């Protein structure tokens, strides 16, 4: 049977993460952002057609994917969030197709410096790199997290072997990641916010021209967002499968309370 999740209960990926994921499990989902790797679950978003095959007992057959290590070191600076880390990685690998149809495996000493919800925020955005799936090594943070939704038995330690071979590696020093923004028309079109503010007119004009070359009908107007030399923000949204994490909602609540 099915499980009905009311809209006021959870963002659906947060619900699946909390209630269905587990270390060493695999989940096939219809949504492209099906990613629960931070809890040791290989989750793949394949679309409704593939899911329908599962409902009638068919197998899910794929060739062995390549595996790329995402080697994390350091610790994020204050104010740098999971979306900043994710966008930095997406911006580095997307155009080159470096992780396309591969598994991104997050390892390294920097993993221990990230709370689980922080890892979730990075993990769910790996879809935008065109990777097939993503998985993280698990640790004490993972073990401490799973009893919160009432599933301590879902924990298993997952780590690379002492000698592990990969098809590639992306080295990320978390201490160097800056607050980052993605501009239209794809999350790979990234800039450090400091760079965008310093060169707002040039960057937004280039982005506007590229975007309008891709769309028909109403044209994108970014230049009007520059007011008095600053960039005007119309709306702040904390939601969705990446931004709508519990930690993010709490952080925004704290900011609004002053």
Question: How would you label these PLM feature ranges?
Answer:
Residues 1-258:
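Fe-S-dependent hydro-lyases/dehydratases of central metabolism
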